[in-house]
Amino acid sequence: MLQNQRACQLVRSKTGCEPLALAVAWGARTAGRCAAGVLGAVKHQRFSDQQLETFAARAPGICPKPVCDAGEPCPLPPQDDAVDVSVIVPVHNGERFLRACLDSILHQNTTRRLQVLAVEDGSTDGSGAILAEYARQEGVTVLHPEQGGSAARARNTGLARAVGRWVLFVDCDDCLLPDAVETLLAAQARTGADIVQGGWQYCDEADIRGAVQQYAEACYTGPRRLDVVELPGTPWGKLYRRTLFERVRFPSGYTCFEDAMIHFWVFPRAKCIASTKPVVYLWRKNTMGLTATSQNTAKALQAYWVAEEMLDGAVRLGLPQDALFACNLILQLANYCYVCVAGLPEADRQTAFACCCLLYRRWAAKLPDPRTLPYAVRLAQRALEQADYGLWQLQGRLFQLIN
């Protein structure tokens, strides 16, 4: 829907004028689709089957596939009816912003009872001392995982101790706005949703706030179900029914892009997903964060490997291979993988592309008719099906306009 489109969000953030934002978004989408149609007809660079196999064989040498914890995850602990929301905070070398993060959680304008689970993941700065101080406050528990090394494992450690009816994830360099908990719970009460996505705002390392990202007041059910792919796959900024994580954990071996599991494993298990317009979260653009620093390194190929992980998990969980599944798979292999590897050398980008095409081919026969999918997904699907490297790059660059 246009309200969720990036152009709409940016214009709304700058002007506060909803009609103007919608008009610009409609114009941007129309222009983007026209450009995609024209350029997509001429910018072909198709790979042969032999080229796909040759390039794909290079992938393990560039970035080996991460190894995740084997077996079924432990059951979630019993729910404590006295706890409304469990807030999980993975912490790794976050001393600079950690106090602001924890204070934003503890000083919420709410009478709800919160369980704050701060997971100390092998920090080498002063984060441990700060956490020891906050651990003396009521409702704050500091956890030390036996095996750490990733935000995925840290979040999983928190889930293993979470007893609230609802779960929030907050990164240690980010903050909740003062009314975040009440805003999200109120939206849940109105809609009956299992997941509620709130708005968020950029914040730099000097605490200067930037563009606001807001979403429609909407429930993504029935005809709107596929619009849920417009919501970000980030763990933060959302309220989750805790039971959605039964048998589901973040892929522990991944140091980046582990949040793909939100779209692949968590969203499909929700009967109703809603979004609400108010901003509830400040996301700090950390230039030294794992995602930012990985996109120009070989680790960016984890964006492909995690797709394999997601498909294996979907089979294990018995999730339907329906239109939403197809959208998630195609967009992961096309748009998202392209964005993640765009900063790599050309040969490595081609390796990622070849892997994506071959994985799509293995699943294509199980997916619904692509003609039933949204335009942006159909364009991405065509790039994968035809092994068209030129179109794959084009749709990746234009996705924010054509979606």
Language-model region placement:
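Catalytic core of nucleotide-sugar-dependent glycosyltransferases
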Residues: V280-N286, T293-Q321, L333-K366
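Donor-binding/catalytic cores of nucleotide-activated saccharide
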Residues: C172-A274, W283-A298
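A conserved acidic beta->alpha catalytic loop
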Residues: S104, E120-A129, Q147
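Short beta-strand/loop segment that forms part of the nucleotide-sugar
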Residues: V89, R113-G122, T141-P145, C172
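Short, well-formed alpha-helical segments that are part of the catalytic scaffolds
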Residues: N93-H107
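Glycine-rich, basic loop-to-helix element that forms the pyrophosphate-binding segment
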Residues: P145-A162
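Short aromatic/hydrophobic "clamp" motif used to bind/position activated sugar donors
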Residues: V167
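Membrane-interface aromatic/basic loop that binds lipid-linked glycans or pyrophosphate carriers
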Residues: L2-D69, S123, G343-N403
